[in-house]
Curated annotation (Swiss-Prot):
The keyword Lipoprotein does not apply. GO terms for biological process: translation. Its main location: plastid. It comes from the Eukaryota. Transmembrane segments: none annotated. It comes from Chaetosphaeridium globosum. This is Small ribosomal subunit protein uS11c.
């Protein structure tokens, strides 16, 4: 006789997070916005690809704006009031995503650019000849 299966609770537990860190990773091909608490546990995330943009449209500023809006939506329910912003990468969507975060009403403690800069490391890709 089969055992009765236990009901598994798959719903996420929503906790109040007053302060957090917003990471914007803007590459040449995509923009990823990740929102964590102070310890580094992910609260919400979004990317241009996850918002439905494909191919070259993922690297546009509008795609970054949509990704930032989608990532910030759950924060209103969880009561985040203060945040720190870490921007990484040379992509086109970094300024647009930051603009949306500023308009959202969350107080920004600081905005830091954490783009890794090599001290003459690997050879960069060659220039395109079209």
């Amino acid at each position: 006789m089969p055992k009765p299966s236990k009901k598994i609770n798959l719903r996420k537990i929503k906790k109040k997070v007053p302060k957090g860190v917003i990471h914007i990773q803007a590459s040449f091909n995509n923009t990823i916005v990740t929102i964590t608490d102070v310890r580094g546990q992910v609260i919400s995330w979004s990317s241009a690809g996850a918002c439905g943009f494909k191919g070259a449209k993922k690297s546009t500023p509008f795609a970054a704006q949509t990704a930032a809006e989608k990532a910030l939506r759950p924060l209103i329910d969880q009561g985040m009031r203060q945040a720190e912003v870490m921007i990484s990468g040379p992509g086109r969507g970094r300024d647009t995503a930051l603009r949306i975060i500023r308009k959202s009403g969350i107080t920004l403690n600081f905005v830091r650019d954490v783009t890794p800069i090599p001290h003459n490391g690997c050879r960069p890709p060659s220039k395109r000849r079209v």
